[in-house]
Amino acid sequence: MTEQYYKIALLFNANKVYDRQVVEGIGQYIQASQCMWDIFVEDEFIYHTDTINQLSIDGIIADFDDPKTVELLQHTLIPTIAVGGSYKQADFYPHFPYIATDNMALVEMALSHLQEKGLSQFAFYGLQVNTHKHWSIERRDAFVELMEKNHYPIYLYEGVQVHAQNWLEEQQKLIVWLKSLPSHTGIIAVTDARARHLLQACEYSKIAVPEELCVVGIDNEELIQYLSRMSLSSVEQGTREIGYQAAKLLHKLLNGQKVSHTPILIPPITVHSRNSTDYRSLTDPLVIQAMHYIRHRACHRIKVGQVLDHLETSRSNLEQRFKNEMNKTIHQVIHEEKISRAKNLLQQTDISIKEITEICGYPSIQYFYSVFKKEFEMTPKEFRLNC
C-alpha cells in the first residue's frame, strides 16, 4: 500500500538557534523514516499568520513558545504537534501533544557543572518577568527551587530587553549587581546571549572570569562563542531530539494512531565546559590577578617577566605563590593556556593550522607541531581529524 502524501507546515522562526535545531531534528526524522511529506516553510524562514489559511495543510509542527503561534492555532482542527519549554504546572500546557525542553533539567545540569568545579555560591541572571517568555520564568523558578532545596542563599538579577538607547545604563546596573556577589560565585545565565552580557560586564569592570566569578549559559549557540574573547561554557539542549520526536508523533497522528497528550520532556545533552567555568580554587589575590592577565595575554607571546612587570612584584615572590596555590610555575601556566587555546581552535573552528600557530603566539608551525605532539602524542592535524 502506497503511503499518502501530506502537506506539512513548520511554524518556526529560524532566526532563533532553538528553532533551527528543532527543524534539523524534524529533517532527521523525515530522512530516517522516508515519510511522504511535502514540507512548507516560508522562503525567509519566518512564517506569516495567513500561512495556514491560504494552504491546504494536513499537519503542523509549531513553536508554542511564540504567543502569536498559540493564538493562531488555539482553535485549529488540523493535526498539530506543539514544541516549547516545560511548565511546572501541568494545566499550563496546550491541548495538543507537546514535546518540551526540560527547563528544570537544564538548570540542574548547569548547577551540577558549577558544583563539580568546586563552587558553593550560585546566582542566576534572567529576564524581567514576561509571560511571553515563560521559559525564562520557569528557569528562574527552577533555580530558586534548587537553591531552597540545597539551603543556598539566592542571588537573582533580571535584566530588561537591551537596545542601543539603554545598553550602557543596563550594563552599569549589571556591574553593580556583579560587584555585590560573593567572590567565587557561579552564575547561571538564562541564555547564552545573557551570558555574553555577563562576560562583557565583567571585562569592562575588571572582574576576573573565572577566577572571581564563573559563568555558564544555556543553548550552546555557536554564534555567541565567536562574539566574546572568553569562551563560554554552556548547556546544550536536546533540540534536535525535540524535533525528531515531534515529527514522529505527527507521523503517528496522520496514520490514524492514538497519541498521548501527556507532555514529553526532553533532557539536555551535556555541558560544554570552556574557559568561563575553568575555575581553580585560588585564594591568593596576586595569583588571581596573574591568572587573569595570563588568560587574556598568553597568546600574545608574553614571557614571565611581563607578568611580573604588570603586577609589580618579584619573580621569587610570585613563583612561590604559584607553587603554593597551584603547584606549578608561571611558565607552565602560560604554556597550558596557549596549548589549551590551540586545542579549542582545532576542535571548534575551521581555521587553518598555520593561522592557529600565529593566533596562539607560536614562533613557527614546526615549533607548534613539536609542542603539540609532546603534549597530546599526536600532531595538530591528527587531533583535528579525531575530533
UniProtKB/Swiss-Prot annotation:
Residues 305-326, 353-376 bind DNA. GO terms for molecular function: DNA-binding transcription factor activity; transcription cis-regulatory region binding. It holds the Pfam family HTH_18. The keyword Oxidoreductase does not apply. One of its GO terms (biological process) is regulation of DNA-templated transcription. Residues 288-386 form the HTH araC/xylS-type domain. SUPFAM superfamilies: Homeodomain-like, Periplasmic binding protein-like I. Keywords: DNA-binding, Transcription, Transcription regulation. PROSITE patterns: HTH_ARAC_FAMILY_1 (PS00041), HTH_ARAC_FAMILY_2 (PS01124). Regulatory protein for the xylBAFGHR operon. PANTHER family: LACI-RELATED TRANSCRIPTIONAL REPRESSOR, XYLOSE OPERON REGULATORY PROTEIN. This is Xylose operon regulatory protein. It comes from Haemophilus influenzae (strain ATCC 51907 / DSM 11121 / KW20 / Rd). The lineage of its organism: Bacteria, Pseudomonadati, Pseudomonadota, Gammaproteobacteria, Pasteurellales.
